[in-house]
Amino acid sequence: MLLSFSLIGSANAGNSNELRLHGNSTNKPAIDAIIKAFNATNPGIRITPTYYGVSDGQAAMMTQLLAGTAADILQAYPGSGAVNSVIALAENGYIAPLTYRPWSKFVAKNDQSLRYKGTIVGVPQTAQGVGYIYSKNILKKAGLTPPTKWSEVKTYCQAAKAKGTPAYGAPWATGWPTIMHSYATTATMVYAKDPDFTEKQYKKQTSFAGSAWVKSFEMLQDMNTWGCFQASPNSTTYAMIQEQLAAGKVLGWLGLPTVIPALKALNASEEWSFAAHPATENAAETFIPSANLVTFAINKKASSNVFARRFMDFLGSSTALEIQVRLSGGIPSIPLAGYVPTSPAISDIMAYRAKGKFFPFIDHQWKAPQIQQALIAGVQGMFAGTETPKSIAEKMDEALLKN
């Protein structure tokens, strides 16, 4: 059932019916379909989307916001740990609050990743989880099953390598995929054991360099030594790994199920599953990172535009949510009647969430994007031989305390 709309703002010269949207290329099919559905009942409003890759999109958004030329509707990121995260954008005065909207009552009161000074500043559509994305059929043919204990990762990688198919795709050239291993392992080794770890960091009571974060980087180094990855991770892009994964040339990748629609487009015959990435020898204590992901904000310059507000409310409607979860995958961030998981991977993530065996993406708690930037550059540097596990953690500490 479509949520009803209550518009705010006044008709003025700013009420242009020509709107622009800044979107993530991963979500293009869903956003295009959402715009089409919106236009079915709002034929007089034209929305022109422009799509970017994650890293390129972050840079373009910041350049355009600084120049005053950014789109009216911005696909952003929850929390404050990325340059395009809603809290960082709100703090810098780039986006407007979204108070008393039809969908806002469904945002959990304890979810601070969408709030700035207590006020909601983003429309959440889907949540995701980080884990090993793979095809059971492809693994069955290889005679392998995903590891559930850390010690099994080595034997899994060696067995996969012996068959000529790397176990894990590593698209480090794209940037953001470098964070996935650390997010997955520290969910278990750090945050499940000490949920207040980040708060203690800001109080200078602990640090990345003095914690299991260093071990997580050492584990990633070990995976490289064991032959877990394809050749030249720093020269491999996300698009290249998608093609290799769909063709069975790599067995899986540690990341988000948002890759699944692209994999289905490349290989419609496969079903894609999810396995938690182990960090210890006790599978029962494994946590996964899981939190809101696809989120939209409204440019402050467009905040008085009733048409922009109308579209923002549509993004929070059941119609738009159904389209997003069906075409992009993910778990509805707002309750959606009749929801059925779009893949086995999503069902697996929901099972972890139902058991409480998850921790939010940690960058949602970081107060500045420089921490994540130090992490990305650090992992790329480690694979280039210019950084060590300890030096990455130290540079992340420096970024946290400086910003």
Regions found by a protein language model. Give the residues of each.
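Conserved N-terminal structural module of periplasmic/extracytoplasmic solute-binding proteins
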Residues: L3-A88, Y100, S104, A268, ...
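Extracytoplasmic/periplasmic substrate-recognition and gating elements
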Residues: A40, A67, A142, K264-S328, ...
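A structural signal for short loop-to-beta-strand junctions that line the ligand-binding cleft
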Residues: Q64, D72, A76, T99-I138, ...
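Hinge/lid segment of periplasmic solute-binding proteins
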Residues: G79-V130, K154, A160, H181, ...
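Long, aromatic- and glycine/proline-rich binding clefts that accommodate carbohydrate-like moieties
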Residues: K109, A275-A276, V325-A374
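Extracytoplasmic/periplasmic solute-binding protein
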Residues: V121-P124, K154-Q205
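Conserved C-terminal helix/tail region of periplasmic/extracytoplasmic solute-binding proteins
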Residues: K140, A351-N403
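Glycine-centered hinge/linker elements that transmit conformational signals in sensory
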Residues: Y202-P233
